[in-house]
Each structure stands twice: as C-alpha cells, then as structure tokens.
Amino acid sequence: MTTYHFIGIKGTGMSALAQILHDSGEKVQGSDFEKRFFTQEALEQKNITILPFSKENIKEDYTIIAGNAFSDDHIEIQKAKELGCKFYRYHEFLGEWLKQYTSIAVTGAHGKTSTTGLLSHVLKSAYPISYLIGDGTGNGHVDSEYFVFEACEYRRHFLKYEPDYAIMTNIDFDHPDYFTSLDDVVDAFQSMADRVKKCIVACGDDEQLQGIHTKVPVIYYGFNDSNDFQAQNVVETANGTEFDVFVRNTYYDHFIIPTYGNHTVLNALAVIAICHYEGISVEHMKQLDTFEGVKRRFTEKEIGSQIVIDDYAHHPKEISVTIESARKKYPNKNVVAIFQPHTFTRTKTFLKEFADSLNEADNVYLCDIFKSAREDSGQLTINDLQKLIPNSQLLSLKETEVLQEFKDSVLIFMGAGDIQKFQAAYEETTTKSTNFQD
C-alpha cells in the first residue's frame, strides 16, 4: 500500500486532504512544525501520525504531498527529490484526486469556507460524500459520488482543477502580494470558469461575475430580480434568518438558516441552486437550518455577560459583514472589534478600507501585524492603522484583561494569523480573575 506523506500537514487544506485520504482507506502520515495548531485535533482523533520535520521522514516508496507554504529548498522536499519520490504540491494532487468523483468547487474572494461547509452539510444528508473545507475539516467516504471542495484563487492554484460544477460567490481584489489589480483577479476567475465541465452557479448581484464568459450554463443567484434564484421576504428572528426562494420568478419554498447577515443568505442560495440543478429534494435542502457552522467563522462562546466570537475575517469587506452579523444577532449589545492584520502587503494595500470597516464597531483594539511565512517585514506598523481609527487602542498579549470592562458586549477576535492566542490569553485571564462579574 502507498504511504502518503504530507509536508506541512497542519495547514488547513493539507489537514483536510490528509483526513480524506485516511477515510478513503489510504495510509497517511505527515510532518510540520511542533507548535500546536487548531487543525491537529482532527488529525489526532483519526490517529494520523504527525512528525517533526526531518529528512529521515522521507522514504523512497512514499508519495509526497507538499504544502504550498514550503519552498523547494525545504529539507524534506530536497530529500524526496533526491530519492525520486512521486511528488505533488497540494493543489496538484487535489486536482488529480477529484477526477474520480462528481466534483463541486466552491470559489470566490469571500464566503468560500462557509459555503463549502453548508453545501457539504446538505449533500451528506442525501448521499455519502467526500468534502474538503478550508477550516481544516476533511471527510472521505469509500462510496462517495460527490466531492465538494474549497478552491482558492491565490497564485491561480485553482487552475489545477477541472471540476464538474463551480460555485462562484464573488470576485474582489485580495492577495495583493500576488494579484496586481482587480482585472488580474477577474482574469484568474475567467480562466477558472473555462475549466468547469457542466455548470457554474454564480452570484448575479456581483458585477464582476456578470462579466464572466462561459461555455457551460450559468445559474445566477442573489437578491436582484434578474437572478434565476432570488431571495425575497428576508426576515431576521431570534433563531436566525428566514426567506422565500423564487426560481425564475416563481415561488419555490421557504427556508430558515441559523445565521445572520445578507452574505449568509447568499451562501444558502448558492447551495439551494446547485442542489435544485442536481435534483436533490427540498427536504434535504432544508437541512440548512441545522448547520452548525465551520471553524473560525463566527464561532461563538459566552464568558460571563460577554459573547466572544472567533472569526477568520482578514479583508475589509469580511470585517464589515462580521460586524453586521453581530449587530443583527445581538442588536442591544456593544460590539468590540479586536483585529490582527494579516501580512504587511495586505495591510498597506487596504489601510484606509480596514479603518473604515473597523470604525463600524463601537470599540476597536489592534494587535501587531501578523508576519506570514511569505513575508516577515514591512515599511508600516500597526500604528499607521491606529492613526486612522479614532479612539482605537493597541492590545498586547500580556494586557488582554482590559477587555473585561466591556460588560454585556460582543467581543469579536478577527484575523487570519494567530489572533486566537489573544483570545486564549483573554479567556485564561478572565477565568482566573476574581473581579470579572457577569
């Protein structure tokens, strides 16, 4: 039996792919930095071996899958090439693996992970499926017909895939360390659209997606009257959001989702549209109302009188919709944003936009810019962002207890770096504090 060795197995996509291969009966192991990462709990639950990096991990008969964060001079990659091992980058292997299924790619600048999770949740109520979610969740099944996966546009990696279907949630300028402009991003999505084999489900409210040319049918969804699938009569309740769906101007059915914000309605519409196209019953679609969410996307807990939320938001638009969701769910509470910018390039590119979106919160705390593996220095500091946000404060890891003063408030920890360690430090301090009252 082939042994699949994952270099960087704790990465969100890598962890998910390793779990899928394991569940499909393959022999899987991997290596990574020894620092604990939130993805490794699922790997440990499945008894997938995680080793520290060492060239001794690599054997001649192994198939090697390397995370995209690691360069060719990594000790394990060098060893694999010396031994002549079968070698793939993550996106290359995924592109080959999904060919054995009816594949559904979920792509877009924002909303990929939540929509992938939502679609997987609905489909698995109807069929045995495999799915790969960008929060590190992966599930395989030996009898899978469908393979649902998150497809990232960064460095045009999604052009290694030829999916049967694609959901396109939106197009926006991001990853400024790679893309040069919005037009460059649009070009990447156009190339992706050219690779889809059966049908594209796209948000018709997105101006850029309206301009995509395709050789396959396109189903549009959204709030506008021109869409094939339209949400109307949207009502927010204590338990979530309810709305009616019209298919080509004809009433279809009423749906409930346990989330808030127009972006979550759009995610649900995308799922409804592709399920309708595939002939899946409305009863299965209504599993939308039992969706419990994905990791690091509006993940909530209560601490005393506070609601503490962990969210991956790292783009100005994502920050805005996360704050919007908090206000809709908790209309009588103050919203406190605790934000850690991710990469110097993104922070510099969107400095004013970050300030504008964070100003939508009642109070703002800023953590130092996260230095990613792709860059470790920049010409600006967190102070440049602070200057644009009146009354904002800097937050250090040793002083998180200042957040205790916000009684009966919503605290949102946002970022794609290690913002979770700030939340963990706050929770630990609060647990020990005798002064923190409900």
Curated annotation (Swiss-Prot):
Binding site for ATP: G108, A109, H110, G111, K112, T113, S114
SUPFAM superfamilies, sorted: MurCD N-terminal domain (SSF51984), MurD-like peptide ligases, catalytic domain (SSF53623), MurD-like peptide ligases, peptide-binding domain (SSF53244)
Cysteine-cysteine disulfides: none
UniProt superkingdom: Bacteria
Record EC number: 6.3.2.8
Pfam families for the chain: Mur_ligase, Mur_ligase_C, Mur_ligase_M
Enzyme class: ligase
GO biological process: cell division; cell wall organization; peptidoglycan biosynthetic process; regulation of cell shape
Molecular function, one GO term: ATP binding
Recorded catalytic activity of this chain's protein: UDP-N-acetyl-alpha-D-muramate + L-alanine + ATP = UDP-N-acetyl-alpha-D-muramoyl-L-alanine + ADP + phosphate + H(+)
Function text: Cell wall formation.
Protein name, as recorded: UDP-N-acetylmuramate--L-alanine ligase
UniProt organism field: Oceanobacillus iheyensis (strain DSM 14371 / CIP 107618 / JCM 11309 / KCTC 3954 / HTE831)
Encoding gene (name): murC
